[in-house]
């Protein structure tokens, strides 16, 4: 089995995004912890050798190839090791590939900003000893609810965001989506097609896999 190194942290949603992708295509992951609280991600050696902007995660492949940014890492893993997987349509099929990139762009531009901001206010701020700004948190919830109107329109016509197959575009939602589902359940269960999509996505990638990603860092 292929084994890759993943530099990251247990509670990093972006680290979980890569871990989940790797496990879905049968790639083993060796976790290399990067302690954000100690500032290890800002040390010169890390900046020079792993991530020029000093964030996580970073993948190191068996041949020494290093890739950073969680969505880029996930695409790389599936392109190299997930042959035949529906997670990433082949560029040789322009329509399927274009619809996938469209859906992936929706996650990146419409879902991630308010979802990650809500998670920061309600969870990560407290981990840093900061108080939650409830006014901001409510703003992010309102934004997510408005975005779900667009999701409902898409998902009323197809099972998943890029069509009728589960792809990375759906998987990319899972780490922050799991947090949103706990923090504000109505965001993902108040609209019938969004609710069905979320349930179907969790059947493909069980919640236990997202939880287990943290255990490998211990």
Swiss-Prot record:
Expressed in vegetative rosettes. GO terms for molecular function: glutathione transferase activity; peroxidase activity. It is an enzyme of class 2 (transferase). Keywords: Cytoplasm, Detoxification, Oxidoreductase, Peroxidase, Stress response, Transferase. Coiled coil: none annotated. It is found in: Cytoplasm, Cytosol. Glutathione binds at residues 12-13, 41-42, 55-56, 69-70. Its EC number is 2.5.1.18. Residues 93-218 form the GST C-terminal domain. SUPFAM superfamilies: GST C-terminal domain-like, Thioredoxin-like. Residues 2-85 form the GST N-terminal domain. One of its GO terms (cellular component) is cytosol. Pfam families: GST_C (PF00043), GST_N (PF02798). It catalyses: RX + glutathione = an S-substituted glutathione + a halide anion + H(+). One of its GO terms (biological process) is toxin catabolic process. Belongs to the GST superfamily. Phi family. Specifically catalyzes the conjugation of synthetic 1-chloro-2,4-ditrobenzene to GSH. Also functions as a glutathione peroxidase, converting linoleate oxidation products into their corresponding hydroxyacids. This enzyme may thus serve to protect the cell from oxygen toxicity as well as from exogenous toxins such as herbicides. This is Glutathione S-transferase PM239X14. The lineage of its organism: Eukaryota, Viridiplantae, Streptophyta, Embryophyta, Tracheophyta.
């Amino acid at each position: 089995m292929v084994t890759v190194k993943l530099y990251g942290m247990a509670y990093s949603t972006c680290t979980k995004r890569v871990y989940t992708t790797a496990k879905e295509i049968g790639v083993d992951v060796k976790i290399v912890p990067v302690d954000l609280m100690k500032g290890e991600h800002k040390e010169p050696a890390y900046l020079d050798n792993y991530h020029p902007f000093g964030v996580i995660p970073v993948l190191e492949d068996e041949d020494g190839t290093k890739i950073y940014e969680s969505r880029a890492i996930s695409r790389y893993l599936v392109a190299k090791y997930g042959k035949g997987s529906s997670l990433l349509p082949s560029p040789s099929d322009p329509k399927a590939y274009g619809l996938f990139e469209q859906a992936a762009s929706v996650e990146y531009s419409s879902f991630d900003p308010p979802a990650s901001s809500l998670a920061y206010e309600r969870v990560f701020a407290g981990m840093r000893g900061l108080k939650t700004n409830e006014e901001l948190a409510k703003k992010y919830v309102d934004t997510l609810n408005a975005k779900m109107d667009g999701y409902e329109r898409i998902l009323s016509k197809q099972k998943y965001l890029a069509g009728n197959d589960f792809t990375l575009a759906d998987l990319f939602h899972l780490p922050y989506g799991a947090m949103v589902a706990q923090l504000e359940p109505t965001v993902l269960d108040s609209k019938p097609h969004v609710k069905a999509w979320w349930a179907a996505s969790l059947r493909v990638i069980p919640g236990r896999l997202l939880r287990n990603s943290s255990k490998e860092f211990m």
